Amino acid sequence: MALPPEKATELKQIIHEQLTRMDVHGKIREVLAESLREEFRTESQQLSEEDLMKALRQRGIVDEVMKELHFMEDRNTRELTSTPKPATHFIDKEPRTLKKTNVDPTRRYLHLQVLSGKAFLEHLQESDPLPGQACSTFTLCLHFRNQRFRSKPVPCACEPDFQDGFLLEVHKDSLGDGSRMADATTMLSICDPVQLVLLKTDTSGETSLVSSHFLEWRSVLGTEKGATSLVVELLGVGAECKVSVGILNVKLELYPLLNKTLSQEVINTQFTLERQKTAEKERLFLVYAKQWWREYLQIRPSHNSRLVKIFAQDENWVNRPVCSYIRPLRAGRLLDTPRQAARFVNVLGYERAPTVGGGGKQEQWCTLLAFLCRNKGDCEDHCNLLCSLLLGFGLDAYVCVGTKGRGQAHTWVMTCGTDGAITFWESLTGHRYVHKPINPDDPPMVEQPKPLYPYKTIGCVFNHKRFLANSQPLDAVEVCVFDLHDESRWKPMSEEAIKSVCSPGSIASLPPFPPLCGSLLDAATESNEIELQLRVLVLEHRKDLGLTTVWDDQLSYLLSPALASYEIERTTGISAGNEEFQDCIRRAVPDGHTFKGFPIHFVHRNARRAFATCLRSPFCDEIISCRGDQMRLAVRVRVYTYPEAACAVWIMFACKYRSVL
């Protein structure tokens, strides 16, 4: 297709400016001078244009120029196509824009490339997805020294097409060394592994944890070329932690190259010393914990039945002290208040650890990265994250282990105020309760406070520094006194013993804590998309009932203040804006007409699933299936985004119709 003369001139000008900026002419002169020198030295034939182009290609100059010349695709041509053609291959619905990274030449980098995947035998029988067909996908998440990365999703297969690279900065945290390029000896002392978390997303959008692996990267320090290839075997999680789920072919490269490499003997010696040091610290803590437990049982034999949890298993079934699951976590500018942090934790999905077969509850306290990447977990995962965030906000926070109704084991969070006030935080709902103890020795005529919280008994409390077991005569929460400094009521563990195995860097086996990531979701776009999908679903549902549907866009818009008010109340505990909402609805509904509204809250963005849930409510079904004179329907969706792709989705269905009775 020929360009108009003015467009051709403009294009030539752009190319000329780009070539001038890149100093391509200077590079050509250098290559030409070099080629002429080689020609005179070899006394060959006259240098041709082909020889010059060959030399330019060999030096990568042609490729460099072509990469710099970007031409934007005309979007208008795509917008004219009303019905897109079916895809002939898997399409990533969330395409990632390639961003240029500012590489600091004074820092050392580890380039981790995932070249391919093999032996994912669970997907051996799966055929390639048909054109336009939705398929399950794998996503790989990485964390290394406060840096987080996420691969593009690839279709699940026996040999998934993983082809991703991640540039990890290798640096020291200590002041003074942070700005200096790390040498081989310094990097050998950095025992932080690269944590890999593999997720599977099914066709309905549900995410499950496939594997959690800690990659030891320091073997690259002993290679002369600064690069090494590894075969990483991924094991399952929970009860399948001994079963291989697949293999990743990984390549590690250091940039820039090391001036001096280390011998493999030195590297192996360092690994051995770290393992021995870790094993000895863990052994000493275990010996201390056993002695502490014997002392606790000697106080009162009935203590044996209390929920005093010292160790917990992670997703790889590794036993770790519960205090190691907590660490003060600052959310930067992603969360502004402790209550907003509680709301964020509340909207993360709740899912009990999966089990194979029947029996009791499967225990699995996930590492923080696995919990955040999956965006759902058990109540212990929620409590550990909430406690860490509250500690980051400067509160004196603890995780409580006990029971709620019917003796079911449960965990929640407690904060102790400077004035002695005790507040309970329910991580799964975001609710807060003030604790006022009941004195069982008071006479019957004395009015006692009625507890509003659902908790029945408490066995222990802990955070990253302290672990205390309840040694009061009764373990009922309502009569407990939470004076944690009173050793006659709370038996403490040695803070030094806890620090030896739970403080950052104390042992090599301690998983590092990742930072929170901001949401990549666009709230307005998501709200519009879900609302349109719900309108289609309502239309189809009423059509099946033989009913016509007329939407009232103005009424739909007027529902927005109510949804905003509900979210503010969930976040702050303060109800606001209800008077204005009632006033505008009264004005929008004429005399003699009836208005009905049904709000509902979700923590997922699946419109079909949400609609099915709404229909199970008789009141909502009455609105959606409403019959009447001048009947108008309305629906409003509002998505509130939080860190880590978490979101609160508020939906409100409403109708107005003329009363004929």
UniProtKB/Swiss-Prot annotation:
The keyword Cytoplasm applies. It comes from the Eukaryota. Pfam families: CEP76-C2, CEP76_C, CEP76_N, CEPT76_peptidase. Centrosomal protein involved in regulation of centriole duplication. Required to limit centriole duplication to once per cell cycle by preventing centriole reduplication. InterPro entries: CEP76 (IPR052299), CEP76-C2 (IPR028926), CEP76_C (IPR056288), CEP76_N (IPR056289), CEPT76/DRC7_peptidase-like_dom (IPR056290), Papain-like_cys_pep_sf (IPR038765). One of its GO terms (biological process) is regulation of centriole replication. Coiled coil: none annotated. GO terms for cellular component: centriole; centrosome; cytoplasm. The lineage of its organism: Eukaryota, Metazoa, Chordata, Craniata, Vertebrata. Keywords: Cytoplasm, Cytoskeleton. It is found in: Cytoplasm, Cytoskeleton, Microtubule organizing center, Centrosome; Cytoplasm, Cytoskeleton, Microtubule organizing center, Centrosome, Centriole. The keyword Cytoplasm applies. This is Centrosomal protein of 76 kDa. Its main location: cytoplasm.
